């Protein structure tokens, strides 16, 4: 949506479409669909191709978290006419999987322009959410998976029951079960950025919100679990053939030992450690520890902020649109560092 909004500001001829499963409910003619589409998920692409569309597609990643094995696992990533990496670590993942892929460019994450430019009224937000502004504010924003396991996602909120000033924001996939808990379901237009600005400490497992918090140099706590949804060695729930060989996938699964390296990244020999880490039951005491040593992991935060989000400067959408325009004009991906 941020990229679409910025394109409208630039007076581009663009449309934002929801591609429905039933072609009867799609309020457009496939013949009138653009020769170029921008996607952040593969399902809309599959649907328009099934309807007969045969143009070029541009893929924009929808988060900053590099822990999931999904990213670059499937064929549609490797057939993209233009693919944007949110940051250098994503580029390294692709190079490890497919060193011959030539259509990728560093782009950043358009949603982060809002995080960069945002200002908040802390007093008003604290009053609205019944928080004490004189005490540390804790944001708990886990990844999805709560509906699959009591050990995943928003279910770990129970370990914060006795902690003051906690805001819990579930992943959209867990909204249904989160409604039974003391969690906030943001409006679609609201998002999580204002809560990242508001919080003094951000707690998650493997969510993109950890990297987003590091962009603002906010201390984070990563929850250590024996498995994470969508991460090795857990089996893939998607019924889709992988572009990566089964031998390579089996090798990655066997190499991943969460008890020894909880935050080992897939396909590359790196550990995504941005701050303090702990088991869920140790969250209360770790929060106190973080408050006493906020600067301990400042170098980790800076490093992973830069690795996960390229050029966090408030101009990500503008820069990405310049590269899209250049691609349409020249028919080849061209890396641009500055905006026109």
Regions found by a protein language model. Give the residues of each.
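Conserved catalytic-core segment of nucleotide-activated headgroup transferases in glycan assembly
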Residues: 1, 107-180, 279, 310-316
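Active-site and donor-binding regions of nucleotide-sugar-utilizing enzymes
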Residues: 1-119, 146
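Short acidic-hydrophobic, aromatic-tinged amphipathic segments that line or gate anion-handling sites
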Residues: 15-22, 184-189, 272-286
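Short active-site oxyanion
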Residues: 34-36, 78-83, 165-166, 198-202, ...
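A donor-sugar binding/catalytic signature common to diverse glycosyltransferases
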Residues: 37, 53-59, 187-240
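Alpha-helix capping/helix-boundary segments
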Residues: 43-44, 89-90, 174, 208-209, ...
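Nucleotide-activated donor-binding/catalytic signature segment of Leloir-type glycosyltransferases, i.e.
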Residues: 174-192
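C-terminal amphipathic helix plus adjacent low-complexity
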Residues: 235, 244-340
């Amino acid at each position: 949506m941020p990229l679409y909004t910025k394109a409208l500001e630039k007076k581009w001829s663009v449309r934002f479409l929801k591609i429905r499963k039933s072609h009867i409910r799609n309020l457009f003619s496939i013949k009138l669909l653009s020769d170029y589409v921008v996607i952040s998920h593969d399902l809309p692409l599959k649907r328009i191709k099934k309807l007969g569309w045969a143009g070029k597609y541009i893929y924009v990643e929808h988060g900053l978290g590099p822990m999931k094995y999904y990213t670059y696992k499937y064929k549609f990533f490797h057939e993209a006419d233009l693919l944007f990496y949110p940051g250098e670590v994503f580029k390294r993942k692709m190079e490890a999987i497919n060193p011959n892929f030539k259509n990728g460019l560093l782009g950043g994450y358009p949603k982060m322009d809002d995080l960069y430019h945002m200002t908040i009224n802390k007093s008003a937000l604290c009053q609205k959410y019944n928080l004490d502004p004189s005490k540390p504010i804790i944001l708990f924003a886990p990844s999805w998976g709560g509906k699959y396991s009591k050990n995943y996602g928003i279910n770990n909120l129970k370990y914060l029951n006795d902690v003051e000033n906690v805001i819990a924001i579930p992943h959209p996939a867990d909204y249904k079960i989160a409604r039974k808990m003391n969690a906030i379901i943001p409006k679609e237009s609201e998002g999580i950025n204002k809560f990242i600005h508001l919080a003094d400490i951000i707690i998650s497992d493997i969510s993109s919100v950890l990297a987003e918090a590091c962009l603002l140099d906010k201390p984070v706590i990563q929850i250590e679990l024996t498995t994470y949804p969508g991460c090795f060695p857990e089996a893939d729930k998607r019924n889709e053939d992988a572009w990566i060989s089964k031998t390579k996938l089996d090798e990655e699964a066997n190499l991943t030992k969460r008890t020894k390296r909880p935050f080992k990244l897939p396909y590359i020999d790196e550990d995504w450690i941005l701050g303090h880490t702990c088991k869920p039951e140790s969250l209360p005491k770790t929060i106190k520890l973080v408050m006493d040593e906020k600067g301990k992991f400042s170098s980790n935060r800076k490093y992973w902020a830069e690795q996960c989000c390229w050029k966090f400067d408030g101009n990500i959408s503008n820069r990405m649109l310049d590269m899209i325009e250049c691609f349409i004009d020249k028919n080849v991906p061209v890396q641009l560092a500055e905006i026109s």
